[in-house]
A protein has these predicted regions:
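Active-site diphosphate/adenylate-binding microenvironment
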Residues: 30-111
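Structural signal for hydrophobic packing residues in well-ordered secondary-structure cores
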Residues: 17-20, 58, 62, 191
């Protein structure tokens, strides 16, 4: 230790709080986002498109839960209403528990509407959680595209296998493969409104 400055904490914080705040990083991020929005005005139907079209339509004072990785990443590009709380169960950093976490949060906070944005692999993986009574304040947006889209991203290790990643890592053609009838019948059999 070379230098010691002894003073009251209030003196220290008062001095630095009087400085004009510089939000340069956030300003850079906002400008970058605006540039991306200008360069890519039309997004093709995809997880990003779903996020773009729905982010500002989530009802005020509600809660969004995101499936891990692709859902979460896609929605990070768009603004949700300021009073909407956003969560993602990233504890296991995998597909396990997104659906059950949302249901648990909705049970513990029944005065708020809870929306879950989840991919098909995560949904089917955690399907057991809807076998019990789901509170009426849970709404699920299932992106049933038949494949683990995350494994298609250039920065995912599975991407180097290209189409060979489909059957082994991206689970293309899994049991629920783009089958809305399967999901509809599962919900009907479990007494869940589809």
């Amino acid at each position: 230790l070379t230098y010691v400055f002894e003073m009251e904490e209030t003196t220290f914080f008062k001095h630095y709080s009087e400085k004009q705040q510089e939000n340069t990083l956030i300003d850079i991020c906002i400008q970058a986002q605006k540039k991306v929005n200008r360069l890519v005005p039309e997004v093709p139907f995809s997880n990003i498109w779903i996020a773009k079209e729905t982010a500002d339509r989530i009802p005020a004072n509600s809660v969004i839960h995101f499936g891990i990785l692709n859902s979460l990443r896609s929605w990070n590009f768009f603004e949700t209403p300021e009073d909407v709380l956003c969560y993602a169960n990233t504890g296991g950093f995998g597909i396990d528990g997104c659906l059950s976490s949302c249901i648990g949060a909705a049970i513990s906070n029944p005065k708020k509407e809870h929306y879950l944005i989840i991919g098909d692999l995560a949904f089917f993986y955690d399907l057991n959680s809807i076998c019990n009574a789901i509170p009426c304040n849970v709404h699920i947006l299932l992106v049933n595209n038949g494949v683990g889209t995350e494994f298609k991203n250039y920065d995912n290790r599975a991407a180097m296998f290209e189409m060979d990643a489909d059957p082994f890592m991206a689970a293309k053609g899994h049991n629920g493969f783009r089958n809305s009838e399967l999901v509809k019948k599962l919900c009907a059999n479990l007494g869940v409104m589809y």
